[in-house]
Amino acid sequence: LSVSWRPTDRLHAYATIPRGLKTGGFNEQSFSDLITTAQQQALQAQISGRGGFDSSTIASATTYKPEHSWSYELGARYALPSAGLELSSSVYLMQVRDLQLTRFVASGAGRMVGNAGSSRTLGFELSATQRLWSSLRAHLNYSLTDARFTEETAAAKKGNFVPFIPRHTYSLMISANEPLSRHLRLLGEVEYSGLGEIYWREDNTTRESLQSTLRARLGLSYDRYTLALWGANLTDNSYTVFQAASPLGRLFQTSAPRTLGVDLSVKF
């Protein structure tokens, strides 16, 4: 369901209520663990003379259910071309049932998808662009996401944050694409961006705080050719971009260090 309203040429408001579905499926990587468990229980049954592997658990151990969601969003866009101004913002609510999350299998040698109960997400997004002078523009983007479990599970308490979803993401950028002559253009941009905090586990015992990085790019374009110097993570900030617990230990992926480069591109 979608409704839009345009009271003026500059203002556009809208409301949407979509329904989402992620299909269920099978976890192929969990079969090796299942076979190992069956062999161990069969051996124990031979020794003790009782028990054994319960084949009725195969379906629950290797499959996961579909994820269903309802989303409700209200938003507006405003443009004032004469002043070089563009604004947009939205608020939304998402309710999810049988949330699908990726976890490691018991042996640690693979991953599987599992259902993690229900969740709700409240969000706010803001985007703005302002022309400062000629082709020089300022850009602002911000997003607030509050995603929490709405029921208690074996791994998470009600009210815990859903893992791998940053609460804040933002970007402040200055960009320019200025003609110097008929064939020559000056290109440049500087961006300060960040995200966090992020929880890595359903029990919320590990997290990464808000982290920011700075990047820049400066170049010249002549007809089909562009030469640019660039730098990423100029402040050389070191932080965790991914973390997961497995039976083999805790796995980390850290941010790339300060990186400098040169690009040469040709348009055909």
Give the predicted meaning of each segment:
Residues 10, 20-24, 31-33, 81-83, ...:
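Structural signature of outer-membrane beta-barrel domains
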Residues 56, 63-68, 116-120, 132, ...:
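Short sequence motifs at beta-strands and strand-loop junctions characteristic
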Residues 3-6, 66, 78-80, 130-131, ...:
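Residue-level signature of outer-membrane beta-barrel architecture
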Residues 1-3, 60, 70-74, 122-126, ...:
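Hydrophobic, lipid-facing positions within transmembrane beta-strands of outer-membrane proteins
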Residues 25-62, 101-114, 149-163, 243-253:
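Solvent-exposed loop segments that connect transmembrane elements
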Residues 21, 193-201, 219-268:
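C-terminal beta-signal and adjacent terminal beta-strands/loops
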Residues 84-96, 112-202, 263-267:
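Gram-negative outer-membrane beta-barrel transporters
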Residues 6, 12-14, 18, 39-115, ...:
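Membrane-embedded beta-barrel scaffold of Gram-negative outer-membrane proteins
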